[in-house]
Structures are given as C-alpha cells and as structure tokens.
Amino acid sequence: MSQLPFWQQKTLAEMSDSEWESLCDGCGQCCLNKLIDEDTDEIYFTNVACDQLNLKTCQCRNYERRFELEEDCIKLTRENLVTFEWLPPTCAYRLIGEGHDLPKWHPLLAGSKSAMHGERISVRHIAVRESEVIDWQDHILNKPQWAR
C-alpha cells in the first residue's frame, strides 16, 4: 500500500515549515513587480523582476536575507495567503488551498524544475532585471486571464 504525499494528507495549516517551503515550485512569479493604480487599486502585472532573482534559475540569490535586502519582498504564510489574490492558478499554495492537486510538472512530482521551465510556467522567458528598467510602465504585461 502506497502512502499519499504530504500535500494530499494535510491542509496548508497542518504542514511543517519544510513541507510548506517545498510546495514552492520556484517559478519566480511572486518576484515580478506589480503596479497598483492608486485610484482603483487595480493590479498591473509587469515582467520586472526583483534584483535578487536569478533570471536563469528563477531562484532568489539571497533567500535568507531577502527581507533585509528588499523591503518590498513579500512572504507568503499560512495566515496571509488568502490576501494574495494575484497568485497564478499554477501556484501550489493556491492549488492546495483550493483543494486541488499539484500539476504533473511540479518539481515535487517531476523530480526537477526542468518540466516547469519547459511548460513556460516560470518567468525565465519574460523577466528583466529591475535595475535595468527605466520606466516600469513600459513593462506592463497584458493582464493574465487568471488574474482576479
């Protein structure tokens, strides 16, 4: 008899810190800057990545010090997850929180991030470094269909 993986046995609230961290597929979508219209609160998605994001691996170059180095860096937690309505439908935290399973390309199932990059889930193919951008408005993406 095979045992179910932890994400099928536990709620997000029941997961250990290491299980929680392992859910992140490392796509880098959280690390793309968003602009918020001050009048309407509408969120505009950009392809401008935080300078701490390694654009090839889509991993934070200074993960342990990210909040110290980037004051706007967000931390997804079990408590604040519901406030991040802009998370893509591919986000494991969102999927598990909504009662879905992980997609077949997720690194916990595929064994590596290659499938995720191959499916173009990661920002590797669109991201530009924040320090190289003059006008962020020139980098606004069409609003993704999944954005609420």
From Swiss-Prot:
**NCBIfam families for this protein:** PRK05170.1-1, PRK05170.1-5, PRK05170.2-5
Please state which protein family the record places this protein in.
Belongs to the UPF0260 family.
Originating organism: Yersinia enterocolitica serotype O:8 / biotype 1B (strain NCTC 13174 / 8081)
Q: Which PANTHER family match?
A: UPF0260 PROTEIN YCGN
Per the UniProt record, one Pfam family is CxxCxxCC
Name of protein: UPF0260 protein YE2365
